[in-house]
Amino acid sequence: MSQLIDRRQNAGKKSTVNRQRFLRRYKSQIKKAVSEAVGKRSITEIDQGEQITIPAKDIYEPQFHRGHGGHIERVLPGNDNFIAGDRIKRPSGGGAGGAGGNASDSGEGEDNFVFELSREEFLELYFEDLELPDLVKKELARISTYKTVRAGVTTSGIPNNINVLRSMKQATGRRVALASPYKRRLKEAEEELERLKQLANPDKIDLLKLERDIEFFKKKIQTVPFIDTIDLRYNHRVRVPSPSTQAVMFCVMDVSGSMDEAKKDIAKRFFILLYMFLTKNYEKIELVFIRHHTSAKEVNEEEFFYSRETGGTVVSSALELLNTIIEARYPPQAWNIYVAQASDGDNWNADSPYCQELLQEKIMPLLQYFAYIEIMPRHHQSLWEVYQQVKERYPNFAMENIDNVADIYPVFRELFKRKTV
């Protein structure tokens, strides 16, 4: 049975290179369209592709063409309606098309350019220039991550690892070394035999001796094997520790009674955005989801986003659980630890100072970054005030306010924007 192997880099899509060139050339217009599309999407649609529209004027390229002046007379091939000298009527019709432009007496127009972005292209543009702040390499404690690398060749191994080229080179060198002396002496004997045969009365004993020598040398050359086991060379591969930066992100969300459905929807959108960003850009990262009201608990992703459990508000319960999990599973010397918290800022007044104490004395010294978003269109409360004091003490503590859905993406980019050197 025949088997087709397609080694084309574009996987059969001939326009892939042109598409990538187009995305690079009009990146600013496409990114603007992507940003506008984000605010119109629901949670379940956030990671899908997008139909992008670019105004025709933005993709205009200079080109050579005939000037409007001058005079030219010609009849195109295949014409059976006009002869030289006829005047062609202007096309009838109204304004020019394209982006609702003003009316034109030319009867011509140009539509906006519309094309589809794939999911991968959409996310690539969506999360460009973002990163986990201050990601540093920690010691590789208890990390069993290895990669196999080439380490030259060896004289022993399994058949699958035979290096054919090196083996044939080795065999060629061995054959040359072993057969060359016999080939040289064979050539000399054949020349001497030819010389004796040209004599009038050659010595038959000498002729017989030379013929035996020639036969001996030929047998010696034939006994040199084409390839021997000592010629075989095998690719040598070794496993080496693979340096990897591992990180853990804690997602903490307030689900108390003061968080109405609109606020919860904003918080869910923010964390889904964060989740997509982390899973796309980092292979070695773990996510821990913590929901809290008067009590906190660690939950899975499904329960974190869609559970309807509610209650009062004690933020310190989430911070205590956060600290407990870090101490039990994520030693700071081996993990880069990040926390993102979303709340409406409504907290039991007596609990806010304790939250400040937990952050300053226990949690912040262990973290790389803490991002707090408060979904509060009205005045801030005690939790925001104590968090501001934490921010003054720790530069790796960031705070932002979100009023509505439209603020999610700008705030997200501000919290996780890539630092330029």
From Swiss-Prot:
UniProt feature, compositional bias: Gly residues: 92-101
Region (Disordered): 83-110
Pfam families: DUF444 (PF04285)
Name the UniProt record assigns to this protein: UPF0229 protein lpp2857
Organism whose genome encodes this protein: Legionella pneumophila (strain Paris)
InterPro entries in the cross-refs: UPF0229, vWFA_dom_sf
Transmembrane regions: none
HAMAP family named in the record: UPF0229
SUPFAM superfamilies registered for this protein in UniProt: vWA-like
Family (UniProt): Belongs to the UPF0229 family.
Signal peptide start and end residues: none
